[in-house]
Amino acid sequence: MLSIPLVCSSDFAPAAQVLAQEFNLPIRVGEVPETIGDCEFVLVLDETGLALQQTGRKAPGAVRAEFTEGAVDHRRKFGGGKGQMIAKAVGVKAGFSPRVLDATAGLGRDAFVLATLGCRLQMIERSPLVFALLRDGLARAHAFAHAQDRELLQVVERMELAAQDSKTYLQGLAPEQFPDVIYLDPMFPERQKSADVKKEMRAFHSIVGTDEDADVLLPLALEHVRFRVVVKRPRKAPFLNNQIPSYQLEGKSSRYDIYTRKKLPD
């Protein structure tokens, strides 16, 4: 992980020490991001969980993996179910909820949507920073759901996470372990600043970086999947690996390129 300081109050120092040792992070106890001037980003551990926060008084909001409130939870409750474009892209239908490998998990938002639709998710994330944020979000969601939301608990229990490079993970799969669907949403440089991308997410992208080897991942995914590979792309972006998909589903700002290996089960 990049050497980003981990900031916490004294109450959270013991938990922060464990996290800092795991990811080799410096700890700053008692400091607050607003007054830190010698680094651009910090990780903050407090009662709301783990978050990435830009420093300074005019910094945008914190970035965290969140599944119990906000837009992600609203989509779980009111998002349109199997009629959503992502559901159609991966092949969710009555009687079939595919096993999905999310090879570029990020903050887990698309994986969570698929899990709400009944899919079992294996999420792979190679960035230690993003892995730490996502693991924390899943742990908080599990604790919350176990206490007060059994339906959410079923969703979260369909999501598994591994810290690994997806290429290495795929190469280690035996044929009987191949997922039904592999989902790719690689991170690319923004061609322009979009009003649709919040300032805090632009900051997140700037520190996490881009998936420059994404073109290599597509052919590898096609060799290690049962039914299809789904690639999420900005609507006007070129095809991944310059490879023409079997078909596409287009939305207002993004699209899904679907590469089929064989027909989904009826």
From Swiss-Prot:
Broad enzyme group: transferase
Reactions mediated catalytically: guanosine(1516) in 16S rRNA + S-adenosyl-L-methionine = N(2)-methylguanosine(1516) in 16S rRNA + S-adenosyl-L-homocysteine + H(+)
Gene3D superfamilies reported in the protein's UniProt record: Vaccinia Virus protein VP39
Protein keywords: Cytoplasm, Methyltransferase, rRNA processing, S-adenosyl-L-methionine, Transferase
Annotated signal sequence range: none
GO MF annotations, alphabetized: rRNA (guanine-N2-)-methyltransferase activity
Chief subcellular location: cytoplasm
rRNA processing is among the record's keywords: yes
Protein known as: Ribosomal RNA small subunit methyltransferase J
UniProt source species: Cellvibrio japonicus (strain Ueda107)
Lineage, opening ranks: Bacteria, Pseudomonadati, Pseudomonadota, Gammaproteobacteria, Cellvibrionales
Gene: rsmJ
